[in-house]
Amino acid sequence: MSTDRYNARDAEPRWQAIWNERGIFRTRNDDPRPKFFVMEMFPYPSGRIHIGHGRNYVMGDVLARYKRMQGFNVLHPMGWDSFGLPAENAAIERGIHPKSWTYENIASMKEQLQLLGLSLDWNREVATCDPSYYAEQQRLFLDLFENDLAYRKESEVNWDPVDNTVLANEQVIDGRGWRSGAVVERRKLNQWFFRITAFAQELLDAIDTLDRWPDKVRLMQRNWIGRSEGLEVLFELSKGSVAAAGTSAVKVYTTRPDTLFGASFLALSPDHPLTQHLAATRPDLAAFVADCKTGGTSAEAIETQEKKGFDTGLTVVHPLDAARTVPVYVANFVLMDYGTGAIFGCPAHDQRDLDFARKYGLTVTPVVLPPGADPAVFAVGSEAYDGEGTLYNSQFLDGLSIADAKEQVARRLERFRVGEQPQGTRKVNFRLRDWGISRQRYWGCPIPIIHCDSCGPVAVPREQLPVELPDDVTFDRPGNPLDRAKAWRDVPCPKCGAPARRETDTMDTFVDSSWYFLRYASDNPDKPLDKDAVRHWLPVDQYIGGIEHAILHLLYSRFFTRALKACGRVDVAEPFAGLFTQGMIVHETYKDKDGRWLFPEEVKLLGDGKAEKLDDGSPVTVGPPEKMSKSKKNVVPPEVVVDTYGVDAGRWFMLSDTPPERDSEWTQSGIEGAWRFVQRVWRQVQEAIELGAPKGADKPASFDAAATALRRAAHGLAHQVADDVERLRFNVAVAHVHEFANAFGQAIASARTASPVPADLAFALREAAEIVTRVVGPMVPHLAEECWAALGYDTLLAEAAWPKAEPELLVENTITLPIQINGKKRDDITVPRDATAAEVEAAVLEMESVRRALDGKAPKRIIVVPQRIVNVVA
């Protein structure tokens, strides 16, 4: 039997071609086997992938192949998140149309992904920029529109005054447009929204059911939804302020009514109606409000900017102490779309309020005393106190806990009246805001609405869908090209026939990815959203992707299924039963003497953190491992790995050593070690074929110790790796295969010294080769197919069953017990698992180490704890 090296260059493309020709990964919806739906977050087609992109796809592939071997009908699809701003940037910078750029990238990246040997059903491939995909998305939009879950309202956006365009929050850098560098303005535009807040409580409650999601992700979603229970409090304007304010009271939402006696100011949003009323006649306030409009619109941008305030000169009466008044400010950190757009500031117990109070010389009155603190000396310095304690400086609340004080304030203010209203009203608020989906860009899904001066927003008739993007647009000037596409834009109103205009905003690309898993479920292109297919396949059994999508994408997807369920389009509420967030592949960075980044293939590593350029031997600075990035050139193309080591070596390395949820460093020594192990498995299988029993040999009636040990190792491997893969512990599965290879190697070496090889050992060798081939199949599928063929099978390993471990071989016949003498461990003893206490005691007393410790004396007592420990009392 030949033990030549495994030739990956020959085997890998050959087996991939066979899989494709036979269509073995094509999934049928009418397959009677139990379903298993595994998918990885689909990629944006940016151009080329590197090996770091492959880790999550390989993990998903291992699970898909394993489940297929377990007898499941596996759906493992792939697609392209192909709308988005980078394509428009390419159009501007390179003069290439977004469609051409995108489809060229899809073709290139698909070719690269296919190198990885992934068991994907390419028949269900989707591209979100394809009209066949976004036609259904437009129908879904109309479903939401007709059910009042999609609506239009005026909202603030980030406006670049130089490029004359709206910027996403991530495009605002330090308050300036990322391309023009201009100071960004906040401008109000009519925008489309999805009413995600209608499902806020349901989305929050259902997090508790997601027991196969990482705790960190669940916590992030809870915090993003941000449910709070508080009190809406009416602060009456002082008599001298009512006329100027044009109103009698300001409504404030607070989660800390217990701290009301510590209030030293009221702060209004720049967009609050009272602010706008005052600014209409006060140029100084109007200028302040205009200044507040610069910078980003995100909550993060507002939170991190310098805190500024404007004293309106108005005062309000303290709701619990009519003798006190509180000044009213306008502050740039108060958001109009949270609570009521007005807050009261208690500087002693909120850091933001404290910073504001110190800046404007406002009083700081602590009202919560920390446990054990002396009220006579406790004071707030540079840090606010936000911990537990008892109330003081608070009149009737003194001595109460925070919880009791909140309740007392709520009850009292609920009884007080301001006009016809209670002064206090209990209120639940959510941090979650409705999802603004409007984007003033070309390369996105058109919103199927027509605007008519007489009829308002009118839905495009469904028979006219899809509203396709026009191809004849230009990117030679700032702004949205759709605004300039008159032939496309100007249409008659579907209701009255009068001249009208198409909506020129396109949808946020997060909409595209919020339902693509539903599209995968259908194998019928004429029914892209098939309710029966969705009922069959959903929820996704295992979703794999980066934790950077923990909030927006995953939360929007959870909303989308609920919204579509409310519209009668699907039956499922939760889209993903299991979620796994993988770590990244990281790599060292390299710079030449001039500070230019270098690709790894341009560098020769010398050891001890030193390196030089391959072409001229000049020194190279080696940086710490970082996320693979094209800009820093610390990327490894999959082609390099495939050409040099084979894709299976790359797959093995990606699965090895590091827990899959952590970052893994790509190293030359690591990939070389993986290649050597692939060769070792190949060699061991070949040797087992040479020395072992022929295919289909009868099982011997009995096995000696050596054969039994090998069989235990092989059956244990099948059992252990199955558990590892089910629990997504791929690195542990790899470790178990390494451990087995050592036992397999010892058995092969033993067989080589025997002449002839005993029949029981020959059978065990053959059985072990077949088991290890099937066990590594999901991880190194090309190698496994080659081994399977060498073992004499004309079927495909990819369609083989997972090996069933014999239960009796999973239980060891012997057990090792520690021996303690006077409480100190002295040795271990291995005895039959069913040995009696008397037999164990006798064996212990025969041990030389025990005799030496007893020094010829008889022990006072020997205590045998069955299958646990032996205690000797001397």
From Swiss-Prot:
Binding-site residues for ATP, renumbered to this chain: 630
Keyword Ligase: yes
Family the entry assigns: Belongs to the class-I aminoacyl-tRNA synthetase family.
Motif ('KMSKS' region): 627-631
Main localization of the protein described in the UniProt heading: cytoplasm
Region (Disordered): 614-634
Reactions catalysed: tRNA(Leu) + L-leucine + ATP = L-leucyl-tRNA(Leu) + AMP + diphosphate
UniProt xrefs under InterPro entries: aa-tRNA-synth_I_CS (IPR001412), aa-tRNA-synth_Ia (IPR002300), Leu-tRNA-ligase (IPR002302), Leu_tRNA-synth_edit (IPR025709), M/V/L/I-tRNA-synth_anticd-bd (IPR013155), Methionyl/Leucyl_tRNA_Synth (IPR015413), Rossmann-like_a/b/a_fold (IPR014729), tRNAsynth_Ia_anticodon-bd (IPR009080)
Subcellular location: Cytoplasm
Residue interval(s) of motif 'HIGH' region: 43-53
Domain of life: Bacteria
EC number: 6.1.1.4
Encoding gene (name): leuS
Record-linked NCBIfam families: leuS_bact (TIGR00396)
Keywords of this entry: Aminoacyl-tRNA synthetase, ATP-binding, Cytoplasm, Ligase, Nucleotide-binding, Protein biosynthesis
Lineage: Bacteria, Pseudomonadati, Pseudomonadota, Alphaproteobacteria, Hyphomicrobiales
Protein's name according to its UniProt entry: Leucine--tRNA ligase
Cellular component, GO annotation: cytosol
Biological source species: Azorhizobium caulinodans (strain ATCC 43989 / DSM 5975 / JCM 20966 / LMG 6465 / NBRC 14845 / NCIMB 13405 / ORS 571)
Annotated CDD domains: Anticodon_Ia_Leu_BEm, LeuRS_core
Enzyme's top EC category: ligase
Annotated GO biological process: leucyl-tRNA aminoacylation
Gene Ontology MF terms: aminoacyl-tRNA deacylase activity; ATP binding; leucine-tRNA ligase activity
